[in-house]
Design a protein with these regions (language model features):
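Short nucleic-acid-contacting surface segments enriched for D/E, G, S/T with interspersed K/R
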Residues: 33-49
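Short aromatic-glycine-enriched beta-strand elements
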Residues: 15-20
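Short capping micro-motif at the N-terminus of alpha-helices
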Residues: 31, 47, 61-63
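Short, Lys/Arg- and Gly-enriched loop/turn segments at beta-strand edges
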Residues: 50-62
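Short, structured beta-strand/loop micro-motifs enriched in basic residues and often containing a Trp
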Residues: 21-31
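Residue-level signature for short turns and capping positions that connect secondary-structure elements
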Residues: 25-26, 36, 52
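Glycine- and charge-enriched low-complexity intrinsically disordered segments
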Residues: 59-115
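Structural detector for short beta-strands of small beta-barrel domains
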Residues: 1-14
Length: 115
């Protein structure tokens, strides 16, 4: 099955991600996942009987749960998941990196150096 990622959030407290995935038939799910890969808006997931491909490459994506998409549920996640990169994906310096469970920031931000 072919899924297009329409929106994504990361949760620094749990080290997991949430993405809105839409199928060709416009079935939408919110996927809560763990893995070494961050699903950016525009990413494509292909699920076959044997493997999961992310943008055409084999990927290690562990789906924790899939929720039926509703705007209310997605808005609730966006409101309560507190990651500066979710609001500013071009963030360069993050003042919360020391509290984050991600070894590397999914958005590429660095921790501010002590002065």
């Amino acid at each position: 099955m072919h899924w297009n990622i329409e929106n994504s959030l990361v949760c620094p407290v749990t080290g997991t991600g949430f993405s809105v995935a839409a199928s060709a038939k416009n079935l939408k799910l919110i996927i809560w996942y763990n893995g070494d890969y961050f699903l950016n808006t525009g990413s494509v997931i292909n699920i076959t009987q044997n493997e999961v491909l992310i943008n055409g490459e084999p990927g290690d994506l562990q789906v924790i749960h899939a929720f039926p998409y509703t705007e209310i549920l997605w808005s609730t996640f966006a409101r309560y998941i507190d990651c500066p990169g979710n609001e500013d994906p071009m963030l360069l310096i993050c003042h919360r990196r020391s509290l984050c469970k991600f070894a590397l920031c999914p958005y590429g931000a660095r921790q501010k150096r002590p002065e």
